[in-house]
């Protein structure tokens, strides 16, 4: 845990914000939802009440799923996390995590997708292959349609599926 002194973007006054290098659902089950909603990363200025989302690198450990997700906020942390997750960092006891699912992600959308897949007990590798196949199929059916991203998401109605985005907006939706 680290305590940072930040300047509020609204009132320009200083306040303290606590970051956590790791979130372990085995130690605090409520943290799983706070990470998913973003609440774990919100700092609220005690002077004016302005709430701001702060991004920083952290490890997410879900013991019941044997899953480790490292969110890397910068390139240096990304490289370090890759070394840890692949057993190339001698300071980490590799035997303890060798049989765990280990992923390093570099943006919040990918993190949220991986967490959703954990919740649904789906293999993210299969989902990634399905996204490539969906994109390939789409290119054959609609060659002029350019897709920026394909995400596996849960809709407001609770259904899950693939959302294809074009210019930041959903252009196609395949649900289960």
Give residue ranges: language-model regions.
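Extended, well-ordered protein cores
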Residues: 162-165
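Long, low-hydrophobicity ectodomains and other hydrophilic envelope-associated domains
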Residues: 135-143, 150
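Domain-exit/linker segments immediately C-terminal to small folded modules
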Residues: 44-126
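N-terminal cysteine/histidine-rich coordination modules
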Residues: 1-72
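Conserved small/polar residues in nucleotide/adenosyl-binding loops
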Residues: 174-175
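Short amphipathic beta-strand and strand-loop transition segments with alternating hydrophobic
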Residues: 5, 147-154
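Short Lys/Arg-enriched alpha/beta "domain-start" segment
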Residues: 126-127, 132
């Amino acid at each position: 845990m680290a305590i940072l002194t930040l300047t509020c973007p609204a009132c320009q006054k200083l306040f303290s914000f606590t970051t956590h290098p790791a979130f372990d659902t085995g130690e605090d089950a409520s943290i799983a939802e706070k990470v998913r909603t973003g609440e774990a990363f919100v700092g609220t200025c005690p002077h004016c009440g302005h709430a701001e989302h702060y991004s920083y690198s952290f490890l997410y450990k879900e013991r019941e799923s044997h899953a480790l997700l490292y969110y890397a906020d910068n390139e240096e942390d990304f490289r370090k996390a890759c070394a840890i997750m692949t057993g190339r960092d001698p300071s980490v006891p590799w035997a303890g995590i060798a049989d765990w699912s280990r992923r390093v992600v570099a943006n919040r959308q990918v993190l949220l997708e991986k967490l959703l897949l954990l919740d649904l007990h789906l293999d993210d590798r299969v989902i990634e292959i399905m996204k490539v196949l969906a994109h390939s199929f789409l290119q054959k059916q609609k060659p002029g349609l350019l897709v920026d991203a394909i995400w596996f998401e849960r809709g407001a109605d609770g259904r899950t599926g693939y959302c294809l985005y074009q210019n930041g907006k959903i252009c196609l939706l395949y649900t289960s």
